[in-house]
C-alpha cells in the first residue's frame, strides 16, 4: 500500500546513503494515499524523517523500477510481481535476507504504537542489511550478536556472550542503550568501559581485554535514532577491523512492551544467537 513499510524504508536509506537516489512504491498502492501519521511520527522520533508524502502506484513508478540497481520488497510474492514487470536487476525480499523469521516485519497498518515501532525497526534493519549486502561491508573479523528473547534471559545471554568473546578473543559490547546492563555485568565480575553514543568512534579500544565490556553510561531515549545512523554501523565496522566483536543487544521483549532495539543494533552481524531460557 506504500503507506508504512516502504516509505519508512526509503527514509532509512536516504539517511544512510544520501548520495543514492531512493524511491518507494507499493504493489497494491493507490496514488495519493497519505502516509500513516503514526509512521511519520515514529520516523521523526528516530531521526529518519519521511520525505514521501503520499503513496505511489506501480504504474506511476515504472520508470524508477526498470532503472533501479536494487529493489527491496517486503514479501516474496511482491518480488514475483516486480519480476513480472520485466525487472531483471538485483532484487531482495525481507523474507530471504536472514534465517531468523522473527526479523521479518509484518504490515504494521492497524497495530498499536509499540507493535508498529517494533515492525518498523525490523524494516529498518533488513533494509540496511539488504543495502550492505549489495554495496559491501568489509571487516576483517567476525561480528557475533547475542539477543536475549526476554528480560529474564538477560543473565544467561550475557554469560553466553562472555563465553563467546573469550573463545573468539573478541571485544564485548552492551548495545542496550535504552537500559544498559548493570547487575548482570557485576555478577560476572566484568569491568565496565564506557562509550558515549553521541561521540561514538572516539573511544580507544585496542586494549579492551576479556574481562571488560563496552557499555553506555546512561539510559537513552529513542535509541533507534542511533542504530539507524551510519555512525553506529561505521563504529562496529571499525571495531571488527581490529578484533572479533560480540554484541549483546536489548531483549526483544521488555516486561511492558515489544522493542525494536535488538533488530536495529544487529543488522550488520555475521552470526546471530537468540537466547530463550
Predicted segments, located by residue:
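Alpha-helix capping/helix-boundary segments
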Residues: 77-79, 177, 252
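Conserved catalytic-core segment of NTP-binding enzymes
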Residues: 99, 157, 165-166, 171, ...
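Phosphate-binding/catalytic loops
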Residues: 81-118, 122
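Conserved active-site segments centered on acidic
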Residues: 1-68
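Glycine-rich P-loop/Walker A and Walker A-like loops and their local beta1-loop-alpha1 context
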Residues: 143-161
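Phosphate-binding loop that captures ATP/GTP phosphates
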Residues: 124-136, 140, 160-218, 225-226, ...
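C-terminal boundary of histidine-terminating zinc-finger modules
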Residues: 111-132, 136-143, 147-149
Amino acid at each position: 500500500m506504500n503507506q508504512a513499510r516502504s516509505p519508512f524504508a526509503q527514509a532509512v536509506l536516504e539517511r544512510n546513503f544520501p548520495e543514492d537516489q531512493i524511491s518507494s512504491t507499493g504493489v497494491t498502492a493507490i496514488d495519493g494515499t497519505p502516509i500513516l501519521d503514526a509512521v511519520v511520527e515514529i520516523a521523526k522520533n528516530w531521526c529518519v524523517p519521511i520525505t514521501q508524502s503520499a503513496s505511489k502506484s506501480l504504474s506511476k513508478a515504472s520508470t524508477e523500477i526498470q532503472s533501479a540497481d536494487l529493489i527491496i520488497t517486503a514479501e516474496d510474492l511482491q518480488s514475483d510481481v516486480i519480476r513480472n514487470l520485466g525487472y531483471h536487476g538485483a532484487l531482495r525480499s525481507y523474507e530471504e535476507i536472514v534465517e531468523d523469521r522473527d526479523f521479518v516485519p509484518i504490515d504494521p497498518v492497524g497495530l498499536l504504537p509499540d507493535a508498529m515501532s517494533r515492525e518498523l525497526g525490523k524494516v529498518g534493519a533488513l533494509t540496511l542489511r539488504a543495502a550492505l549486502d549489495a554495496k559491501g561491508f568489509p571487516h576483517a573479523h567476525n561480528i557475533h550478536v547475542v539477543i536475549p528473547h526476554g528480560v529474564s534471559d538477560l543473565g544467561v545471554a550475557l554469560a553466553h556472550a562472555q563465553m563467546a568473546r573469550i573463545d573468539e578473543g573478541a571485544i564485548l559490547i552492551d548495545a542496550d542503550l535504552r537500559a544498559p546492563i548493570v547487575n548482570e555485568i557485576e555478577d560476572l565480575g566484568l569491568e565496565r568501559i564506557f562509550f558515549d553514543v553521541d561521540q561514538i568512534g572516539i573511544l580507544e579500544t585496542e586494549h579492551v581485554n576479556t574481562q571488560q565490556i563496552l557499555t553506555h553510561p546512561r539510559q537513552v531515549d529513542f535509541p533507534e535514532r542511533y542504530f539507524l545512523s551510519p555512525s553506529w554501523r561505521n563504529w562496529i565496522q571499525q571495531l571488527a577491523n581490529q578484533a572479533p566483536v560480540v554484541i549483546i543487544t536489548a531483549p526483544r521483549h521488555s516486561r511492558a512492551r515489544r522493542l525494536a532495539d535488538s533488530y536495529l543494533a544487529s543488522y550488520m552481524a555475521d552470526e546471530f544467537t537468540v537466547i530463550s531460557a
